[in-house]
Amino acid sequence: MSEPASISAAIAGRYATAIFDLAQEAKGIDALSADVDALTAALAGSAELRDLISSPVYTREEQGDAIAAVAAKMGLSAPLANGLKLMATKRRLFALPQLLKGLAAAIAEAKGEMTADVTSATALSAAQAEKLAATLAKQTGKTVKLNVAVDESLIGGMIVKLGSRMIDTTVKAKLASLQNAMKEVG
């Protein structure tokens, strides 16, 4: 991780912990979860919002007013809205994407959930996704949500990333392994 990215992650981690703790005390984890999903979607869909959080052209006051308006319009819960306002006054809104990832991870942990990133050569059917989620849930003892992506260059099989573990059952990886073994032999 590069130094600026690690600084952003550290800043976001502190804010995420504080916001999560406040929401937990107020028994507002479900509301916070919905807010995180909505704000993540808004950030992905709005170039203006991404510009607002990253551009040094905006003053603290302009960022604070704009983020307060966004929070009010979206009906964000008090812990998150107040946290965003504080981040704006401290010129820390650039860490918003990392904050949202940190909050999503904390919420998932509190709910006993994990997210698995699955990349497959072809789209998984609903039955395949359900069976994979059930198998992973059995291994981890937690509810598993799947983030599914398709990469046709894998030829066949899938890559599953669950926490710090990665399971690669792709044809592409097996061919690469076979190629390496053949290079060693001859």
Swiss-Prot record:
GO cellular component terms attached to this protein's record: plasma membrane; plasma membrane-derived chromatophore membrane; proton-transporting ATP synthase complex
Localization annotation: Cellular chromatophore membrane
SUPFAM superfamilies the record matches: N-terminal domain of the delta subunit of the F1F0-ATP synthase (SSF47928)
Superkingdom, natural source: Bacteria
Lipid bilayer topology: Peripheral membrane protein
Signal sequence segment: none
InterPro entries reported for this sequence: ATP_synth_OSCP/delta_N_sf, ATPase_OSCP/d_CS, ATPase_OSCP/dsu
Bilayer-spanning residue ranges: none
Main location: membrane
One example GO MF annotation: proton-transporting ATP synthase activity, rotational mechanism
Database matches in Pfam families: OSCP
Keyword vocabulary terms for this entry: ATP synthesis, CF(1), Hydrogen ion transport, Ion transport, Membrane, Transport
Described purpose of this protein according to its UniProt entry: F(1)F(0) ATP synthase produces ATP from ADP in the presence of a proton or sodium gradient. F-type ATPases consist of two structural domains, F(1) containing the extramembraneous catalytic core and F(0) containing the membrane proton channel, linked together by a central stalk and a peripheral stalk. During catalysis, ATP synthesis in the catalytic domain of F(1) is coupled via a rotary mechanism of the central stalk subunits to proton translocation.
Recorded family membership: Belongs to the ATPase delta chain family.
Subunit-structure text: F-type ATPases have 2 components, F(1) - the catalytic core - and F(0) - the membrane proton channel. F(1) has five subunits: alpha(3), beta(3), gamma(1), delta(1), epsilon(1). F(0) has three main subunits: a(1), b(2) and c(10-14). The alpha and beta chains form an alternating ring which encloses part of the gamma chain. F(1) is attached to F(0) by a central stalk formed by the gamma and epsilon chains, while a peripheral stalk is formed by the delta and b chains.
Name of the molecule in the record: ATP synthase subunit delta
Organism: Rhodobacter capsulatus
